[in-house]
UniProtKB/Swiss-Prot annotation:
It is found in: Cell inner membrane. InterPro entries: Na-dicarboxylate_symporter (IPR001991), Na:dicarbo_symporter_sf (IPR036458), Ser_Thr_transp_SstT (IPR023025). GO terms for cellular component: plasma membrane. Disulfide bonds: none annotated. The chain crosses the membrane at residues 23-43, 47-67, 85-105, 144-164, 181-201, 220-240, 293-313, 333-353. The keyword Cell inner membrane applies. Belongs to the dicarboxylate/amino acid:cation symporter (DAACS) (TC 2.A.23) family. The lineage of its organism: Bacteria, Pseudomonadati, Pseudomonadota, Gammaproteobacteria, Enterobacterales. Its main location: membrane. It comes from Klebsiella pneumoniae (strain 342). GO terms for biological process: serine transport; threonine transport. The keyword Membrane applies. PANTHER family: PROTON/GLUTAMATE-ASPARTATE SYMPORTER (PTHR42865), SERINE_THREONINE TRANSPORTER SSTT (PTHR42865:SF8). This is Serine/threonine transporter SstT. It is a multi-pass membrane protein.
Length: 415
């Protein structure tokens, strides 16, 4: 009688190996392929498209099932940390906008306002942005899932979760089982990240390159420098204020395991499953992160606030419009509000720049030229913006959960 030999060990080693190291290998190979053969690099871009498509496909179902399951099984009296997380989201976004204002005054940038972008229609005012968000809340659930409308998905998931609290245990068990099944699919998709990053890097470098970015080197330095300051100084200060210990191990973990993915996928929605997996790895409260992560992907937009502020003030400096301190502070507030609505606007943060430009009386045709500049530098700007936005979702969720656990431990010692 013959016995079957186990499958080759290299497959299991790949499956169990360090995902971050594999992603770095994929990144290096992607750069090399783009340098050696552009046609081949463009061809393997399909791997990146498939990876991002898979993440985007599973994310809406994941959010619906996790939120519904966590609320349906929530026990009366069981505490979650949603309120402090929401406060951190808003404070972080406003702090990012203020930082961008300071950077823009210390390192003023100017633009070459020659490109037209008449085919793009931005929202006419902040009221329209807020109206769009409200309309997203009352979206048809099937339509919300098909179009990845996370505001609508959250509303339906919360509503169904509360309704199912009074359901049978069999129903709750079924929801939990489906939730675990979707989570398993997400883990499988994430294991293909090295191939996805390889394809994304290869095709991006082969099709766009970085030649067009050199003309906007100073503007990019201000944007990226501001985002780095927020990621490595401002956010750690907020986390330290919350957890009262060295924040950098947590900050660097979130940047490494969430920011790296988001940088290459350039999609907060696609990074929701990655953040969910990171929160599970950090052993955070499932009831909390299943709500806070998709909520953060919708309203926690520090990177968008920076983009709106820096590009608006670049236009202001180009046109020699004087700006006083109260106006700069008001711009920070407007940029923060615009950033929170960026997920509800096609084109994201760039198409909300005309709203901020309107504060300074900048005509719409000039504002749209600023938007066009944003699209030119978008290869790097959008990647950095998404990395900051998405990694901060996981960071603030972890900080609030850790602070809550510490408080519970202190209360237990006192009693």
């Amino acid at each position: 009688m013959t016995t079957r030999t186990p499958p080759s060990g290299w497959i299991s080693r790949l499956a169990q190996g360090s995902l971050v190291k594999q992603i770095l290998i994929g990144l290096v190979l992607g750069v090399l392929l783009a340098l050696v053969s552009k046609p081949a690099a463009i061809a393997v871009g399909l791997l990146g498209t498939l990876f991002v498509g898979a993440l985007k496909a599973v994310a809406p179902v994941l959010v619906l099932m996790l939120v519904m399951a966590s609320i349906a099984n929530h026990q009366h009296g069981q505490k979650t940390s949603i309120r402090p997380i929401l406060f951190l989201y808003l404070l972080g976004t406003f702090s990012a906008a203020l930082t961008a204002v300071l950077f823009s005054f210390v390192f003023p940038s100017t633009l070459h306002l020659t490109t037209a972008a008449d085919s793009i229609t931005p929202p006419s005012g902040i009221v329209e942005v807020l109206r769009g968000l409200l309309m997203s809340m009352v979206s048809n659930p099937i339509d919300a899932l098909l179009n990845a409308n996370y505001i609508g998905i959250l509303v339906w998931a919360v509503g169904l979760g509360f309704a199912l609290r009074h359901g049978n245990d069999t129903t709750k068990n079924l929801i939990n089982d489906v939730s675990h099944a979707v989570t398993f699919i997400v883990k499988v998709v994430i294991r293909f990240a090295p191939l996805g990053i390889f394809g994304l890097v290869s095709s991006t470098l082969a099709t766009t390159g970085f030649e067009t970015l050199w003309g906007y080197a100073q503007l990019l330095l201000v944007l990226v420098g501001c985002m780095l300051l927020v990621a490595l100084v401002i956010n750690p200060l907020l986390v330290f204020w919350k957890i009262r210990r060295n924040p950098y191990p947590l900050v660097l973990t979130c940047l490494r395991e969430s920011g790296v993915y988001a940088f290459f996928t350039r999609s907060s929605a696609a990074n929701i499953p990655v953040n969910m997996a990171l929160c599970e790895k950090l052993n955070l409260d499932r009831d909390t992160y299943s709500v806070s992560i998709p909520l953060g992907a919708t309203i926690n937009m520090a990177g968008a606030a920076i983009t709106i502020t820096v590009l608006t003030l670049a236009a202001v400096h180009t046109l020699n419009i004087p700006v006083d301190l109260p106006t700069a502070l008001l711009l920070s507030v407007v940029a923060s509000l615009c950033a929170c609505g960026a997920s509800g606007v096609a084109g994201g943060s760039l198409l909300l720049i005309p709203l901020a430009c309107n504060m300074f009386g900048i005509p719409n045709d000039v504002a749209m030229q600023v938007v066009a500049v944003g699209f030119i530098i978008g290869v790097l700007q959008d990647s950095c913006e998404t990395a900051l936005n998405s990694s901060t979702d996981a960071l603030f969720t972890a900080a609030a959960c850790i602070a809550e656990d510490d408080q519970l431990a202190k209360n237990a010692l006192r009693s």
